[in-house]
């Protein structure tokens, strides 16, 4: 279940929900 946002969850519209701020 990997993806451009992995391991962060993504919405159906393709928006990424980056929970880990350390990746900024």
From Swiss-Prot:
Q: What is this protein called?
A: Lactadherin
Residue stretches in coiled coil = none
Q: Reply yes or no: does the keyword S-adenosyl-L-methionine apply.
A: no
Give the source species. Equus asinus (Donkey)
Which gene holds the coding sequence for this protein? Answer: MFGE8
Describe the function of this protein.
Answer: Specific ligand for the alpha-v/beta-3 and alpha-v/beta-5 receptors. Also binds to phosphatidylserine-enriched cell surfaces in a receptor-independent manner. Zona pellucida-binding protein which may play a role in gamete interaction. Contributes to phagocytic removal of apoptotic cells in many tissues. Plays an important role in the maintenance of intestinal epithelial homeostasis and the promotion of mucosal healing. Promotes VEGF-dependent neovascularization.
Q: Name one GO cellular component term.
A: acrosomal membrane
NADP as a keyword of this entry, yes or no, is: no
Q: How does it sit in the membrane?
A: Peripheral membrane protein
GO biological process terms, alphabetically, are: angiogenesis; cell adhesion; single fertilization
The UniProt keywords, alphabetically, are: Angiogenesis, Cell adhesion, Cytoplasmic vesicle, Fertilization, Membrane, Secreted
Q: What is its main location?
A: membrane
């Amino acid at each position: 279940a990997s993806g451009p946002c992995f391991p962060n969850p993504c919405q159906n519209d393709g928006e990424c929900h980056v929970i880990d701020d350390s990746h900024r």
